[in-house]
Curated annotation (Swiss-Prot):
Organism of provenance: Sambucus nigra
Gene that encodes it: SNA-I
GO annotation terms (biological process): defense response; negative regulation of translation
2-gamma repeats: 534-567
Subunit structure: Tetramer of four pairs of disulfide bound A-B chains.
Protein's name according to its UniProt entry: Ribosome-inactivating protein SNAI
Residue ranges the record marks as coiled coil: none
Length: 570
């Protein structure tokens, strides 16, 4: 009888322990001690350092693409290094701890009050290593956005983000561990913490919006561009890792703007200017060790795209693509009259859909139009690829927009910004008339946000630029980014952001666009804006916005040299 009673007791205990979702079991082994990165809402100014620390913890190796860190594939991460714990605390003192997978930055579980919850379909690696000293339970929904939004009853486009929302989310997760009640507030809280932690670590655009809301103690709802970033992180990562050395995508990244218009992105430069993507999901190992020829890079201050990787299962496949090429004043590279004859000049013309502006970038380093090669000679022309010296048909496209003929060391140049101008080869002086973009030929209209989350503004021709509080729809804060590397006043696109000279402390002003080296700018993946002619960075003078001076200066690593483009500044 005692044996029967004991068995009945154990059976009842097991049934009661199942709870609403079913208790999870795990072997009694000593779990790994995972690194921890915490954030307390009472310290609003610690949000940015918190994200930097989280990024540092999830990036285990030195794998990069275009200087962006690539997360390690699952096969290269041991169980003992698989997760990072993220305790979040609200002003009431409530704390919940998230478990984040270093392979993909996903939130896979959370814990508080001696209980932990895992999403439906959780893995043995998660259950056996996370929160093993708590009562583990499994939720009846997964952690993807579709499942979470189904639990809430509406999309995350309607769910505010900000300090108040994060406060409530922490309380909702903690309360659920106490009562195991309604899943709607739980799912809503998870949508908030996932975006304010994981997505902000993936995209500086999202980080900036959240950081601004925390600083201003305000709330905002995600715009459609932000949501499309979140939905396309995987495809962005894949395209970047499989891009040609100059950042030319094999496919198209589909985003949406705030008005729900489609944005088709075909190169890294435009994607970065739109999203400021900060971390990549592993897709494949790049086959290219460097995106530069020696001739194209020697004078550059920021060596942007360098691929580095270890031993991977999958190697990226780089394919040929056909795109338009935009240069000085937004004009496109065009075969004169579309004549298919050797020696026909290549010229500038307004961008259109004509076939004589469609260039195929081959993996052998040639750029072709209907099979004929873009050829370096006394001028730039098309020619039969088999009848000219091979070195005359080879080109290197750099991420900064330079197109170089490696044999001569000369770069593709537009002598004038006029329709019909024949292109030439000249020494590289990093001038705007030597800047090009492949694909995405239309200028991008944006705000430029810098030190103390303030916006860059212009005050007309021959005047300085400076920082002021961001104001949506203020035309003086709107800029057009051109494929030639110029930053133009959006309300008057004949005016360019210009350095007065090329020495440290030289002022940055607004002048007529002339295609000079003082008017060409590169948005770097480290958050700086460089002038490749001067080899200096855009800098808020003395870290004092009241001086109303933006200058050129040597790299310091200080926050007054950090910038981000955004279509929604406040």
């Amino acid at each position: 009888m005692r044996l029967v009673a004991k068995l009945l007791y154990l059976a009842v205990l097991a049934i009661c322990g199942l709870g609403i979702h079913g208790a999870l079991t795990h072997p009694r082994v000593t779990p790994p001690v995972y690194p921890s990165v915490s954030f307390n809402l009472t310290g609003a100014d610690t949000y940015e350092p918190f994200l930097r620390a989280l990024q540092e913890k999830v990036i285990l190796g030195n794998h990069t693409a275009f200087d962006l860190p690539v997360l390690n594939p699952e096969s290269q991460v041991s169980d003992s290094n698989r997760f990072v714990l993220v305790p979040l605390t609200n002003p009431s003192g409530d704390t919940v701890t998230l478990a984040i997978d270093v392979v993909n930055l996903y939130v896979v579980a959370f814990s508080s009050n001696g209980k932990s919850y895992f999403f439906s379909g959780s893995t043995a690696v998660q259950r056996d290593n996370l929160f093993v000293d708590t009562t583990q339970e499994e939720l009846n929904f997964t952690g993807n956005y579709t499942s979470l939004e189904r639990q809430v009853g509406f999309g995350r486009v309607y769910i505010p983000l900000g300090p108040k929302s994060l406060d409530q989310a922490i309380s909702s997760l903690r309360t659920y561990t106490l009562t195991a009640g309604d899943t709607k507030p739980l799912a809503r809280g998870l949508l908030v913490v996932i975006q304010m932690v994981s997505e902000a670590a993936r995209f500086r655009y999202i980080e900036l919006r959240i950081r601004t809301s925390i600083t201003d103690a305000s709330e905002f709802t995600p715009d459609l561009l932000m949501l499309s970033m979140e939905n396309n992180w995987s495809s962005m990562s894949s395209e970047i890792q499989q891009a040609q050395p100059g950042g030319i995508f094999a496919g198209v990244v589909q985003l949406r703007d705030e008005r729900n218009n489609s944005i088709e992105v075909t190169n890294f430069r435009r994607l970065f200017e739109l999203t400021y993507i900060a971390v990549l999901l592993y897709g494949c190992a790049p086959v290219t060790s460097s995106s530069y020829s020696n001739n194209a890079i020697d004078a550059q201050i920021i060596k942007m795209p360098v691929f580095r990787g270890g031993e991977y299962e999958k190697v990226c496949s780089v394919v040929e693509v056909t795109r338009r090429i935009s240069g000085w004043d937004g004009l496109c590279v065009d075969v004169r009259y579309g004549h298919y004859i050797d020696g026909n000049p290549v010229q500038l013309r307004p961008c259109g859909n004509e076939c004589n502006q469609l260039w195929t970038f081959r993996t052998d380093g040639t750029i072709r139009w209907l099979g004929k090669c873009l050829t370096a000679s006394s001028s730039v022309m098309i020619y039969d690829c088999n009848t000219v010296p091979p070195e005359a048909t080879k080109w290197v496209v750099s991420i900064d927009g330079t197109i170089t003929n490696p044999h001569s060391g000369l770069v593709l140049t537009a002598p004038q910004a006029a329709e019909g101008t024949a292109l030439s080869l000249e020494n590289n002086i990093h001038a705007a008339r030597q800047g090009w973009t492949v694909g995405d030929v239309e200028p991008l209209v944006t705000f430029i946000v810098g030190y103390k989350q303030m916006c860059l503004r212009e005050n007309g021709e021959n005047n300085f630029v400076w920082l002021e509080d961001c104001v949506l729809n203020r035309v003086q804060q709107e800029w057009a980014l051109y494929g030639d590397g110029t930053i133009r006043v959006n309300s008057n696109r004949s005016l360019c952001v210009t350095s007065e000279d090329h020495e440290p402390s030289d002022l940055i002003v607004i002048l007529k666009c002339e295609g000079s080296g003082n008017q060409r700018w590169v948005f770097n993946t480290n958050g700086t804006i460089s002038n490749p002619n001067a080899k200096l960075l855009m800098d808020v003078a003395q870290r004092d916005v009241s001086l109303r001076k933006i200058i050129l200066y040597r790299p310091t690593g200080n926050p007054n040299q950090q910038w981000i483009t955004t279509t929604h500044p406040a």
